[in-house]
Amino acid sequence: MQQPEWKLLDAADMIMGRMCSQVAKLALLGEHIVIINAKDAVISGRRNQILAKYVHLRRDIRNLSNPRRGPFHNSRPDTFLRQKIRFMLPKNHRGAEALKRVHVYIADIPDVKKSKYANAEPIIVRNASKERLSRKSVTIEDVCNNMGWTRKRGKELSI
């Protein structure tokens, strides 16, 4: 079986929504995308409003009959970003296949998987740079830390 050609996207200082929508489009077109530095992507807006929004989602929405049933909200930066991409894909088989073509890592690619992405071609998402913002922003790492994520030193977990 032929190895897919991977596209490498560095999410550091990128606006999360703009980046995720472009990644979703590329994945639907059949591109294989690996995203690194997910924790450094930014969400535009005032820090206290953004943190309050995500903490409210995390703590207040529960199933009254069985709180363990969900909905489940991700507090790890890689799964948080992957979930946002999933929300931008169609809810059918085509969207599920597109999501399989997207790999997200918290920081850099782990040494074990570097050979898989050795020939990855770097790509740039237009109009998604943080410099475009004239207002305040908060990183995904800050949001996830506020939602309860504690980074394990020495281990880079990813999907």
Give a label for each model feature.
Residues 1-159:
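Ribosome-associated RNA-binding proteins
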